[in-house]
Amino acid sequence: MDSRDIQALTAVKLYYGEGLTQSQVATELGVSRPTVSKLLNLGRERGYVRIEIHDPREEASETATQMRDRYQLNDVRLAQPARAGNAVLLRELGRVGAELLDELVVDGTLLGVSWGKTMYSVSTQLKSKDVSGVEIVQLKGGMSHSDKSTNDIRTIGAFCHAFHAYARTLPLPVIFDSVETKRIVEQDRFIASVLALGRTVDIAVFTVGAVDHDSLALNLGQLSTTEKDLLVERAVGDACSRFYRADGGIALPEVDARTVGISLSDLRRIPTRVLVAGGAHKAAAIDVALRTNLATHLVIDDATAERLLALDSPDSPAAPASPGSPGSPDSSTPLTATE
């Protein structure tokens, strides 16, 4: 630890521990006020001080209760961004999602993790937890063939660091060029074992995406222009890179057949399914995901939750017993039955 770190520690203790103002800290240390500000920032970066905000609205509010009742969820946590902006929203969703996972993960948990900007935000805000025997399983391929990054490795790495866990990764693209190539790769013993493990995790944490031409899932270099256009036209969202329509059916079966990772029907079989998603642009994708039973636990921002509650209550399509059957969310036909 060098002299700068020691000085930062002293500044942190005076400012946060003793309640001195930055000007008073500057006087104590014999430095300028801007220097104190830099020392406090350094202290936060080094982890010398951790600021925890407990907002009771995140766990107990009328909105959360209504969301639980509307979508028959086990738990709903509401992020309450202090100001507008996508970066602020992502950070708050990630923080609340990380707090929920800290409660759910215990010794021996098999945790399935997806990727995306929201998942990366969750991963960067996880706190170290004293658990053992935890394994982190990547739920879908994450290699990109473009300049867009999925941050899959960094996301998985952060989860492993927080929970002292072993990683089971899928070093593959999420969508292959052909069904034949995908099937050959899936026959590899290592790949097959990770995919099988993903179907048996105790907890799955994932996000959903809106589908437009700027979506990350459409810009990894794995889809043709025609396929992108069709997905934008037909799909309302994607979960684990499985694109679905407004009625819950698979938007483009030929793309779904080339996709490596957990299917929507297998996702529904996971005992605890944590969906972390927010923003007005994702409202329709979140609504369909919840109505089709993709999640048991939800982390969402308050404004988007209110938007969903304002929707007319639709008939809730539910997944039939067997995947691929007529009306299944994993088939191209719409859902008609409820459970």
Predicted region positions:
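Conserved phosphate- and dinucleotide-binding cores of soluble alpha/beta proteins
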Residues: 2-12, 16-30, 35-41, 47-54, ...
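Short N-terminal secondary-structure initiator segments
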Residues: 7-26, 67-84, 109-114, 119-120
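HTH-adjacent hinge/linker in prokaryotic transcriptional regulators
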Residues: 34, 38-110, 124-132, 144-149, ...
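Conserved beta-strand termini and adjacent loop/short-helix elements that scaffold enzyme active sites
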Residues: 79-81, 139, 170-172
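Gly/Ser/Thr-rich loops at beta-strand to alpha-helix junctions
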Residues: 111-121, 211-212, 279-282
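Short Gly/Thr/Asp-enriched flexible loops that form oxyanion-binding sites at enzyme active sites
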Residues: 118-129, 216-225
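Catalytic or ion-translocation cores adjacent to nucleophile or general acid/base/metal-coordination motifs
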Residues: 135-143
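Intrinsically disordered, low-complexity tandem-repeat regions
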Residues: 315-333
